[in-house]
Amino acid sequence: MGNTSSERAALERHGGHKTPRRDSSGGTKDGDRPKILMDSPEDADLFHSEEIKAPEKEEFLAWQRDLEVNDKAPAQARPTVFRWTGGGKEVYLSGSFNNWSKLPLTRSHNNFVAILDLPEGEHQYKFFVDGQWTHDPSEPIVTSQLGTVNNIIQVKKTDFEVFDALMVDSQKCSDVSELSSSPPGPYHQEPYVCKPEERFRAPPILPPHLLQVILNKDTGISCDPALLPEPNHVMLNHLYALSIKDGVMVLSATHRYKKKYVTTLLYKPI
C-alpha cells in the first residue's frame, strides 16, 4: 500500500520519475520489456540480401558511369559565321564562347565577317564597333536581368546534316577514285608490247541500230509515200551509201531541225 520512505527518497532524487520495478527474475514488466532481435532464417536472408544483389548493383554503377562519361563528352564543334553589316572602321566580336574577349572581324567589302568553330548549344554575343558595344537588331536577341541586350544564336546538329552527308559522300567518292585509279598488281617501267593477234584484229562490227536505215523500209499504205517515218535519234548525222546499181551510187544523210527531220539524197554516177 503506497510507497515506502526509501522509495519516496529515490523518487525525489530522480526528479519525480519512478523507475520500473523488476520482478524476482530480474526482468521488467511486459509493457516495458525491450525488443530483442532473435536469430532466424529470415534474418540470414536479410543480412545476405546485399551479397545476392551485388551483380545487379555493379551493372547499375557501370551504367551510371557510362552515362556520366557521355554527359561529359564535348559536343562537336560546328563552323558558325558571324557577320556585321552596320558599317564601321574596327569591329570586334565578343561572346560567351570566348569568355567575352574581343575577337577582331575580317573586313569583306562593306561587311565584317568571322567564322568560328562553336560547340552545339546556345551562345550569346555582342559587337564592339568603333569603341561602342552594340548588338545586331536583325538577329535574335535576349535581355538579361540587368537590362543588357545580347544577340543569341543556337548551334544545332540538324543544321549541319546536309554538310555531314556531303562529307560522307565525298569520302566514299575519294575511296572509289583511289581504287579505280590504282588497280592492284605490280608496277614496272617496261612499255606495253602489243601482241600479234591484237595488231591484225578485225574492225568492230557495225552497231545493229545503224542497220535500220529508213530508206530501206517499206512505207505503209496508209502513209504518205512522200514522207518517211520518224527516224531513231542514233541515225542522225550519219552518211549512208546504197549498193551501186546501174552505175549509180546513192548517198543519204538525215538531220534534225527543231522538231522536223530532213533526209537528203545524193545520186552520183559511177
From Swiss-Prot:
Assigned protein family: Belongs to the 5'-AMP-activated protein kinase beta subunit family.
SUPFAM superfamilies (UniProt xref): AMPKBI-like (SSF160219), E set domains (SSF81296)
Protein name: 5'-AMP-activated protein kinase subunit beta-1
Compositionally biased spans, kind Basic and acidic residues: 21-36
Lipid-modified residues, N-myristoyl glycine kind: G2
Positions of the UniProt region annotated as Glycogen-binding domain: 68-163
InterPro entries xref list: AMPK1_CBM (IPR032640), ASC_dom (IPR006828), ASC_dom_sf (IPR037256), CRP1_MDG1_kinase (IPR050827), Ig-like_fold (IPR013783), Ig_E-set (IPR014756)
UniProt remark on domains: The glycogen-binding domain may target AMPK to glycogen so that other factors like glycogen-bound debranching enzyme or protein phosphatases can directly affect AMPK activity.
Any one Gene Ontology cellular component term annotated for this protein: cytoplasm
Domain of life from the UniProt record: Eukaryota
Posttranslational mods: Phosphorylated when associated with the catalytic subunit (PRKAA1 or PRKAA2). Phosphorylated by ULK1; leading to negatively regulate AMPK activity and suggesting the existence of a regulatory feedback loop between ULK1 and AMPK.
Protein keywords: Fatty acid biosynthesis, Fatty acid metabolism, Lipid biosynthesis, Lipid metabolism, Lipoprotein, Myristate, Phosphoprotein
Entry-annotated residues carrying Phosphothreonine: T4, T19, T148
Region described as Disordered: 1-46
UniProt lineage: Eukaryota, Metazoa, Chordata, Craniata, Vertebrata
GO annotation terms (biological process): cellular response to nutrient levels; fatty acid biosynthetic process; nail development; positive regulation of cold-induced thermogenesis; signal transduction
Function: Non-catalytic subunit of AMP-activated protein kinase (AMPK), an energy sensor protein kinase that plays a key role in regulating cellular energy metabolism. In response to reduction of intracellular ATP levels, AMPK activates energy-producing pathways and inhibits energy-consuming processes: inhibits protein, carbohydrate and lipid biosynthesis, as well as cell growth and proliferation. AMPK acts via direct phosphorylation of metabolic enzymes, and by longer-term effects via phosphorylation of transcription regulators.
GO molecular function (one): protein kinase binding
Residues modified as Phosphoserine: S5, S6, S24, S25, S40, S96, S101, S108, S182
Subunit record text: AMPK is a heterotrimer of an alpha catalytic subunit (PRKAA1 or PRKAA2), a beta (PRKAB1 or PRKAB2) and a gamma non-catalytic subunits (PRKAG1, PRKAG2 or PRKAG3). Interacts with FNIP1 and FNIP2.
